[in-house]
Amino acid sequence: MRRLLPLLDHFRRDRAGNIAVIFALTLVPMISVAGGGLDYIRATAIRTKLQAAADAASVGSVAKQSPAFIAAGTMSSDGTIAAGVADATNIFNANMSGITGYALNGLNITVSRVNGVVTSNVQFSADVPMMFLGVIGKS
């Protein structure tokens, strides 16, 4: 920071105008690139949290003591396990409570028994609004 202040003072004192014009012209793209990087980091962090919540919901809904596993043991044939879907939804929502900065567009959860095996699939879709790139019209 100490090196930056004399440099900025030099730009301010320069009366030729070339430096100030070039600096002004390059400032907008530089800020846009830096802001885009921050938006990307934020979106990636939210995607990671959503994926972790989906993984926890998928695994937790078919754990040995889960409602889905217990219900699958009482089923006489293969099919969807409603208790598992509800349990997975609760696990996903619990993991994402308190996390902001995204809009969940869709959450598709299936928990079923096929050939005696309990399987779970959790898919989600979400939008993360861009803060810095939104200023220049990018979404």
Task: List each model region and its residues.
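Short, ordered "entry" segments at domain starts
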Residues: 131-139
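Short amphipathic secondary-structure patches
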Residues: 2, 37, 41-49, 56-130
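Alpha-helical structural signal
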Residues: 18-21, 34, 55
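N-terminal signal-anchor/signal peptide hydrophobic helix marking the start
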Residues: 16-28
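N-terminal leader/signal peptides at the extreme start of proteins
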Residues: 1-16
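Single-pass alpha-helical transmembrane signal-anchor segments
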Residues: 27-37
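N-terminal transmembrane alpha-helices
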Residues: 11, 19-20, 40
